[in-house]
Amino acid sequence: MRLRSFAFLGFMLLVAMAPSMASAQPQPLDRIVAVVNKDAIMQSRLEDRVTQVRRQMASRNVPAPNEADLRRQVLDRMILEQIQLQMAERANLSIDDTQLNATVRGIAEDNGMSMDEFADALEEDGMSLASMREQVRREMLLRQVQQSQVASRVNVTDREVERYLDQQGETADTAYHLAHILVSVPESPTPEQVEQAQAKVRDLYRQLQNGANFAQLATAESDGQQALSGGDLGWRRGDQLPSLFADVVPTLSNGEVSEPIRSPSGFHLVKLIDTRGQQGEQKRVVTENRVRHILIGTNPNRNDQQAEALARDIRQRIANGESFAALAQEYSDDDGSALDGGELGWTRPGQMVPAFEDAVKALDVGELSQPVRSRFGYHVIELEDRRRQDVTRDAQREQIRQTLFQRKVSDEMEAWTQEIRSGAYIDNRLEDGRQ
């Protein structure tokens, strides 16, 4: 059974995959292929990653470059990953088992499986549950670093949202399938470095004009985050285009590659793979539920059976007339609502985990649920009120806010990766053949 893609993972997942199986053949003496500040990256790790990336590329029908180019690209991603893991260590960031368990359980639920079924499916895909857990832990840690260092720098104001809402035009109703090549320049580059990058991007552009395969060239030569996916950026609505490309992409024909585009991070080539029309915004009316809950989770002193038993006891006490709010303040493990007596306010579809939402849908106003199991623990839920609400304008604003936020994060991410790379000691022995 093949698992659905773990879409929540960040861009480093492709090269963060653990090897699926250890070779039974005798291994040659391991060597250092790169030193990143105080840490070494060994050749065995690099070869494991290269093997995994080749499998990933084959499954996505992305043409693989030659071995040397692929190893160089994978090592470059491993170096960037190592810098971020070192930043996490210095900042004392960590992922505890409770967070990890909830995330892994959520992945299983998103694939419609129990944990036992999920473990079996992983085995069929050649990966143990233990190795998958460590992969997810590492990726969550990288996301923490990126969140603290990049997303925290980005802010979208209400004025920006309203201005965009007033100004968005026809491009918002068109979706574009894009691919991208980046030829980067260092932070504060010299004129010679800029000239070298410009010469390289011009050469790549000429090759593409002469019929070179964009995906293969991106995999071999791009410094962009999606290089190992053939530079594929996927489908983007017009209002989701990176600000750098927003004026260029609508002028391209399907299959056309833009001329080099200059940015502080380097030179970009963008290919428009395909275009499709989008339906206009439809009126959106949803059912909102005002709910409160008490969450009983597991911890080192309370196993799953004990958590369920406590939740049932609390539910019975409420049914017997005790105060829901008082019991929530005393027992609930949801720090965000416990002090408010478990109040979650008005909730809309998609805001809660599926098990919680399904339970709420089945309740009548004023009714108390039986304990409901989710990835977070056991919930005792009371439906306080229900209403129909037109959220069209709110949905538009939130969509635009997320679009502008992701656009800013994308722009900031390129600058940040250059910044952390420039600030690190990197001895890449693969580049000069010393490995």
From Swiss-Prot:
The keyword Chaperone applies. The keyword Repeat applies. SUPFAM superfamilies: FKBP-like (SSF54534), Triger factor/SurA peptide-binding domain-like (SSF109998). Residues 173-274, 286-385 form the PpiC domain. One of its GO terms (biological process) is protein folding. Residues 1-24 form the signal peptide. This is Chaperone SurA. It comes from Chromohalobacter salexigens (strain ATCC BAA-138 / DSM 3043 / CIP 106854 / NCIMB 13768 / 1H11). The gene is surA.
